[in-house]
């Protein structure tokens, strides 16, 4: 019997973004690992997982978290270890969004958004997705509006990392306003 798609996807994200070595995987510089090796790693927790099931997870993922190229797979964003990503630059978005617990607001408005334990700051093209993401870290969430033109004027490139996900090195406080 197959485990739930969501449970396997969460494990895939953990392995590909944070801990490939824990499962005996060695990503290349772009974060790719052999798909067959990921399937074997997943089987240590979920023995019934197949390559077809993993491909289905990737195809149905609404956020575009994963990418398969030939017989290799990677997470498209969210890595806590260095990877060289070749994402297309987003030169069109005017505003992007970031949901965060209210307790973080004062420091963000003072210091800006930083990648923390990741390589990039994650932003969304969707207000609702940003709020949903922020709720993973606390219930009382505020919505930050990021002026993408302000980022570009400061020499910061915004990249398309997923369907509605954008990544940037950092977000200076002067590019942030609070959605009221």
UniProtKB/Swiss-Prot annotation:
Disulfide bonds: none annotated. GO terms for biological process: tRNA splicing, via endonucleolytic cleavage and ligation. Signal peptide: none annotated. The keyword Nuclease does not apply. Coiled coil: none annotated. Keywords: NAD, Transferase. It is an enzyme of class 2 (transferase). GO terms for molecular function: NAD+ poly-ADP-ribosyltransferase activity; tRNA 2'-phosphotransferase activity. The keyword Transferase applies. InterPro entries: Ptrans_KptA/Tpt1 (IPR002745), RNA_2'-PTrans_C (IPR042081), RNA_2'-PTrans_KptA (IPR022928), RNA_2'-PTrans_N (IPR042080). Its EC number is 2.7.1.-. Belongs to the KptA/TPT1 family. Removes the 2'-phosphate from RNA via an intermediate in which the phosphate is ADP-ribosylated by NAD followed by a presumed transesterification to release the RNA and generate ADP-ribose 1''-2''-cyclic phosphate (APPR>P). May function as an ADP-ribosylase. This is Probable RNA 2'-phosphotransferase. It comes from Thermococcus onnurineus (strain NA1).
């Amino acid at each position: 019997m197959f485990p739930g798609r969501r449970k396997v996807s969460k494990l895939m994200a953990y392995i590909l973004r944070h801990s490939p070595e824990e499962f005996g995987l060695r990503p290349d510089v772009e974060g790719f690992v052999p798909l067959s090796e990921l399937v074997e790693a997943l089987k240590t927790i979920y023995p019934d997982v197949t390559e077809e099931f993993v491909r289905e997870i990737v195809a149905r993922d609404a956020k575009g978290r994963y990418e398969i190229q030939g017989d290799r797979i990677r997470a498209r964003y969210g890595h806590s270890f260095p990877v060289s990503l070749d994402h297309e630059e987003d030169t069109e978005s005017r505003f992007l969004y970031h949901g965060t617990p209210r307790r973080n607001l004062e420091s963000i408005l003072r210091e800006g958004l930083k990648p923390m334990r990741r390589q990039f700051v994650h932003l969304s093209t969707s207000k609702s997705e940003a709020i949903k993401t922020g709720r993973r870290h606390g219930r009382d969430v505020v919505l930050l509006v990021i002026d993408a033109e302000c980022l570009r004027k400061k020499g910061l490139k915004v990249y398309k990392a997923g369907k509605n996900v954008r990544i940037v090195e950092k977000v200076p406080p002067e590019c942030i306003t609070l959605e009221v």
